[in-house]
């Protein structure tokens, strides 16, 4: 059985980590966890500052026990589950997002909904906004300290090593919610 965790992962944060670890617990030793990255081919912009391949690398650096697949966005919600299934295959969706759960249930999928405490602290737009404020800070210990409550250390190191935070400072507008 495949347990599927779906998200944009812009970037992988501790809310995602909690969800993926829950899926790993459910999968045990016999089943597989597939992390499906949505909006994988979107143009780089404030809401999607990292490419699908960059996000895949972040996830694989954090945990190499999961399979990571990329899903191009088709902007067609009624047909999206069938489109996504071509990338992640059949299985059980593990999610904390009510809309995603409903979309998959409408397509006759088994869905396990996981409650996240402090969900508001693990919203991608908040994390991207914080990262943008740190994008020109050269004190990497300070960057690590501020981001450590939201991001796994491996993702923070990836962002620093790849100079991937600086990109956020180049956007003319703020990062978008959602």
Residue ranges: model-predicted function:
Residues 1-178:
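Nucleotidyltransferase catalytic core that binds NTPs
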